[in-house]
């Protein structure tokens, strides 16, 4: 039968995790191509360096993910227990929150590039070429700026990869081993194909349209990640309270904390084996069939923070200072020095003119 060689739950899990990864990676690659691949020798060199950072981040995340997965499998078959499962939600929540913060900062920077494209080209080139000086105050910040295109893909691939390994391992207990390889490969290929389409579309679109669309997409993912991170931390707290994994009880009573629940539906669970694609909504939008106060409030707080942040940035661009801050006034000493310099220049010019006028033969 088809289900003996192709497990649909495994395909959905792998496709969901791959999709979230390729969205971020394809946006980064398309952004680099739009911004830096203009034929200039210096910019082309910077473009190749940053593109290499993206792929190195993907490869490093995949390598660490494979090491962690091998360790988990080894511990499971040696000790007979899943050591990751006991604190899975803590790790997932921390990774989600960290990724949301990084994507938020990068999204704001992406949106400003349309007006500051030339400045960003120079800034990226300088960040790549300038060495990191040990012991300086901004050493870590400079390192993050220099290798930003490595850090985000690394964290994304690591988080999604470990999550996929854990979910696939859980699904395979109810499916034959031969039903796993094919859906894993198909999920990776389909997710990669969607990423390639996003990359090609982003590379050929007008820069400002691409920046707006990609930033909106990144913020949707980041908002979902932020909400999922808070939800995972609350889910771990509930697991500790009941002394087990609440997900194993299904979607009915006992699978959620009724005192901390805003809504709950006994279907549409993103973690169920027959989720019917709800896992994709969970990956992109942060959907949960059992919403908690923390997950809903954090989702709304995230968007309020983003709106306030962009309003503040806009105010700073138009007014020259932040809200509730006094406008910068010109330094009188600087003005006096500049005016005296100008007056000296005028006096010198007049003196030179008099000398020329009084010269013989003038």
From Swiss-Prot:
Residue stretches spanning the membrane: 11-31, 56-76, 91-111, 148-168, 179-199, 207-227, 293-313
GO CC aspect terms: high-affinity iron permease complex
Topological type in the membrane: Multi-pass membrane protein
GO molecular function: ferrous iron transmembrane transporter activity
Upregulating conditions: Expression is repressed by iron starvation and up-regulated in the absence of the sidN siderophore synthetase.
Region of interest: Disordered: 326-350
A Pfam family hit: FTR1
Keywords, ordered alphabetically: Cell membrane, Ion transport, Iron, Iron transport, Membrane, Transmembrane, Transmembrane helix, Transport
Subcellular location: Cell membrane
Coiled-coil stretches: none
Biased composition (Low complexity): 333-342
Function: High affinity iron permease; part of the reductive iron assimilatory system (RIA), a siderophore-independent high affinity iron uptake mechanism.
Cited PANTHER family: IRON TRANSPORTER FTH1 (PTHR31632), PLASMA MEMBRANE IRON PERMEASE (PTHR31632:SF2)
Protein family: Belongs to the oxidase-dependent Fe transporter (OFeT) (TC 9.A.10.1) family.
Name of protein: High affinity iron permease ftrA
Annotated organism of origin: Epichloe festucae (strain E2368)
Gene (UniProt): ftrA
């Amino acid at each position: 039968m088809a289900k003996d060689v192709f497990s649909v739950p495994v395909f959905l899990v792998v496709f969901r995790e791959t999709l979230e990864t390729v969205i971020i990676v394809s946006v980064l690659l398309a952004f680099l191509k739009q911004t830096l691949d203009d034929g200039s020798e210096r910019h082309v060199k910077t473009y190749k360096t940053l593109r290499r950072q993206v792929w190195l981040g993907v490869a490093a995340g995949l390598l660490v993910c494979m090491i962690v997965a091998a360790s988990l499998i080894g511990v499971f078959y040696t000790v007979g227990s899943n050591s990751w499962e006991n604190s899975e939600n803590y790790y997932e929540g921390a990774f989600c929150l960290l990724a949301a913060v990084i994507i938020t900062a990068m999204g704001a920077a992406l949106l400003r590039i349309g007006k500051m494209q030339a400045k960003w080209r120079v800034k990226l080139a300088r960040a790549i070429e300038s060495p990191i000086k040990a012991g300086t105050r901004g050493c870590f910040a400079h390192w993050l700026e220099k290798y930003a295109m490595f850090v985000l893909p690394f964290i994304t691939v690591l988080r999604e990869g470990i999550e996929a390994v854990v979910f696939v391992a859980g699904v395979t207990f109810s499916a034959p081993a031969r039903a796993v390889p094919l859906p894993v490969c198909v999920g990776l290929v389909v997710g990669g194909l969607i990423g390639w389409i996003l990359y090609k579309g982003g590379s050929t679109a007008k820069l400002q349209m691409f920046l707006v669309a990609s930033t909106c997409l990144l913020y949707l993912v980041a908002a979902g990640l932020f909400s999922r991170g808070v939800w995972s931390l609350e889910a771990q707290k509930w697991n500790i309270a009941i002394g087990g994994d609440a997900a194993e009880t299904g979607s009915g009573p006992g699978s959620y904390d009724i005192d901390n629940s805003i809504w709950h539906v006994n279907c549409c669970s993103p973690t169920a084996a027959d989720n019917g694609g709800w896992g994709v909504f969970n990956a992109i939008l942060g959907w949960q069939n059992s919403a908690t106060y923390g997950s809903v409030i954090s989702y709304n707080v995230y968007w309020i923070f983003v709106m306030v942040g962009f309003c503040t940035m806009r105010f700073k661009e138009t007014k020259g200072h932040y809200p509730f801050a006094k406008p910068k006034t010109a330094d009188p000493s600087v003005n006096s020095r500049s005016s005296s310099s100008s007056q000296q220049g005028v006096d010198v010019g007049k003196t030179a003119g008099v000398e020329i006028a009084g010269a013989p033969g003038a």
